[in-house]
């Protein structure tokens, strides 16, 4: 909070040591929400796949490759041009694009009568003609499908909801439509786009041409699995020029992959021989990683002159490609590409630190005075914890909401101590379980290896008492707050956030905060006495 600079300057001149010891009084007591580990300063998490994409992009750019966006939609005939006799096998793995046909909607007299009935009025001859023209325009694709409802609403002078009802009731053709496939496909290899791109620019661009693209490809797998996705990212590059050879592929592989921690490299012929590569040029790249040892990370080769000739490309072209997800799996030590790519569908087990941040208090004082009150109750109760009852100790006296309030910690019964033994317990998260434990040898492992929430039973109960005393003072009343035997988190004012509770139950861990607390806090307003 703000403080009087002149007052502290004067105080320091008069009694420096005293002023130094009084320094903490300028601090506003933090609520539990603003205490560690609940208070966190952390950067947002980036997605591992996109982090890898960005790293690959920057590496390619640093190697002098220009970035390119290749076509995603590839016509079937282009696959035949590139793969030759192999095209049929390749097309078995691609997604064809399809769509709903535009129905040829005829409007007979009976249908017009149905529309009139739904509209509650007779259409004019001019409106009927406009209706026919609109449906014909839709058939000819002059009107887009998502605009049809609005256009019909304008013609019929009604609202969109009624038009939807008319289409559903009067024109069943719209409900019985089945998708029809086109001859267009989604790109299954980045190569499909490189032929088209190079065919357009190779004679208009200084050689050698060095391009790269990191983008999405689609492959119709029988099923997705730990190492296969139907939609994946390819990090691909090409070098086109008169003197380009397979040696360029080796050099680019080393330059690109060394940026990701790979050291030694090994190149060996690929048993798969794609027809768009020259014979004996398709090469697998193995690289040694400090953690993973030798791993296959990329493939490169020289495009076949036969395939290049289909696009009028008259210079050799080296192509290198690697799967972004494959590289990310190695980098992030992942064993399932589905979980790496779509973590939201694979609930992550929270760490003890993350669980501790999700445990807070149900009730806390709202005012600064209320926070001071809670700290005072905690301090006085701890100082007199073993005093026998009946007893009462003044903990705090001050103003709340314009009213003078006096607060005491007390034990009204005989043969009982001011506090129960569990008041000193502290909440820890240990191996996914939430435990309230004392400072004793039996629980030393939990206290040493677990994560503290920074919440004690006494502190939580004192905060609840302060919050309720605050509320009572706002209404001009005193109150008595008692916490007895704790069985559930709510008994000691604990709140476990829903995400943390879900993680605890999903992993079959436990919450054990049982213990005798037996704290009584009473507030009075002297003016009411």
Swiss-Prot record:
MF (Gene Ontology): ATP binding; phosphoserine-tRNA(Cys) ligase activity; tRNA binding
Domain of life: Archaea
Reactions listed under catalytic activity: tRNA(Cys) + O-phospho-L-serine + ATP = O-phospho-L-seryl-tRNA(Cys) + AMP + diphosphate
Entry keywords, A to Z: Aminoacyl-tRNA synthetase, ATP-binding, Ligase, Nucleotide-binding, Protein biosynthesis
GO biological process: translation; tRNA aminoacylation
Function: Catalyzes the attachment of O-phosphoserine (Sep) to tRNA(Cys).
Protein name (database record): O-phosphoserine--tRNA(Cys) ligase
Gene field: sepS
